[in-house]
Amino acid sequence: GDSYEKLESEINARSITLEDRIGQFIFGYGEDPIEKVIGKTLLDKKLTLSVAESCTGGYLSHLITSIPGSSAYFLGSMVPYDYQIKMRQLGVKPETLEKYGAVSEPTIIEMANIVRAKFNTDIGVATSGIAGPGGATPDKPVGTIWIAYSDKHQTVTRKLQLSKDRMINIRSASIAVLNLIRLSLP
């Protein structure tokens, strides 16, 4: 451009066009990670959050609590990795696990709803899946992960089909949950 102002105007115009096309994937501007953006949003809306995570093994809770002041909105989490713990400690119905398995939409819905009720939070989220490298079945390959968001008005689920790499799956699923929170907030 001929000048800084003209160049800035062109960048702004193109940014608006880009936002129109991929806005759902933009969570902020600058260098703030999504967990910080979500934390600020929860604070601003005076909402609380709880987590039940299986395949992510606490990584999602780690991301949330890595932000200073997260205790103002994050009340706690459970990591019910085992079937028995999912039933006894979290409260997933045995018949749900028997009929659908741990890596299923009905199970993840129960997990998100139950953790929200147990912790008495505005929002409950959950993860369950096959992070890998083992544990796959023909209908549930490595990288199959269910995530859920629950508040008093709605429960939203997503089925992810990620990679064969365990750490990539754990990280990607955790970020996907944070994005699901962002997209689902009232």
Question: Predicted segments — roles?
Answer:
Residues 1-2:
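Short beta-strand-to-loop capping motifs
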